[in-house]
């Protein structure tokens, strides 16, 4: 939301079809509508839905090549991906996939800055961003995902995660998000090696 406020161009790739996030017969179509509505609120310039099978995301060479191609087409200054210790298997697979895609283009003329973000649990973080003024807007976007919110109280859980990130921040900061800002030279390591290095710090 801060990116939208500052006029920064952003793009979103949704990797899986969301088919296992409930029992509704039209769940895939519903989740597609939800993500399109949320993307509109967040101001993404483009939305890419790849429809890989939910909970079975596999970072094969083909999908890594596809991700690498999108990155080279968009030429972003930064690529965001889920943190390495997320609970959902697709989130962890997405992190590995993006890392390998960035490794593929590391020797080319540009390399985006890799930054991981938190979804459901605290991950290694070396950057905290105050989202106090964006928290209501973030909650409004999360409320769009009615198909998922009826399965669990995700907006409350995410708000709790954001509240927890204020532990070391000034008291006027009510909500914050945690990120890990990697250096491009880190791409010389495998994702497993880099994760162990980060956790051992």
Whereabouts are the PLM-identified features?
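Active-site environment of divalent metal-dependent phosphoester hydrolases
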Residues: 19-22, 55, 85-91, 122-124, ...
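Conserved strand-to-helix beginnings and helix N-cap segments that scaffold or border functional pockets
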Residues: 25, 60-64, 91-95, 128, ...
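Flexible loop residues that form catalytic
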Residues: 18, 52, 84, 119, ...
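Helix-loop-strand module that forms the ligand-binding subsite of alpha/beta enzymes
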Residues: 83-109, 115-123
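Proline-aspartate-enriched helix->loop->beta-strand connector
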Residues: 44, 67-86, 91-94
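Active-site rim/loop-helix segments in enzyme catalytic domains that contact anionic ligands
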Residues: 1-74, 99, 103-109, 140, ...
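Hydrophobic/aromatic beta-strand patches that form the interior of the parallel beta-sheet core
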Residues: 11-13, 48-50, 80, 115-117, ...
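The feature marks non-catalytic terminal segments
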Residues: 42, 109-201
């Amino acid at each position: 939301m801060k990116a939208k406020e500052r006029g920064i161009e952003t793009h979103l790739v949704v990797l899986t079809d969301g088919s296992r996030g409930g029992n509704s017969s039209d769940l895939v179509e519903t989740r597609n509508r939800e993500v399109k509505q949320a993307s509109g609120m967040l101001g993404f310039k483009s939305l890419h839905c790849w429809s890989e099978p939910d909970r079975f995301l596999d970072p094969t060479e083909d999908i890594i090549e596809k991700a690498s191609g999108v990155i080279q087409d968009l030429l972003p200054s930064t690529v965001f991906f889920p943190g390495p210790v997320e609970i959902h298997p697709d989130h962890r697979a997405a992190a590995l996939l993006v890392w390998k895609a960035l490794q593929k283009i590391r020797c080319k003329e540009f390399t985006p800055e890799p930054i991981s973000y938190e979804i459901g649990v605290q991950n290694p973080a070396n950057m905290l961003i105050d989202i106090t003024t964006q928290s209501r807007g973030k909650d409004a976007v999360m409320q769009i995902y009615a198909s998922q919110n009826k399965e669990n109280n995700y907006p409350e859980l995410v708000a709790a995660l954001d509240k927890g990130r204020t532990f070391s921040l000034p008291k006027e900061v009510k909500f914050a998000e945690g990120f890990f800002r990697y250096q491009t030279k880190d791409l010389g390591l495998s994702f497993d090696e880099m994760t162990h290095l980060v956790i051992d710090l």
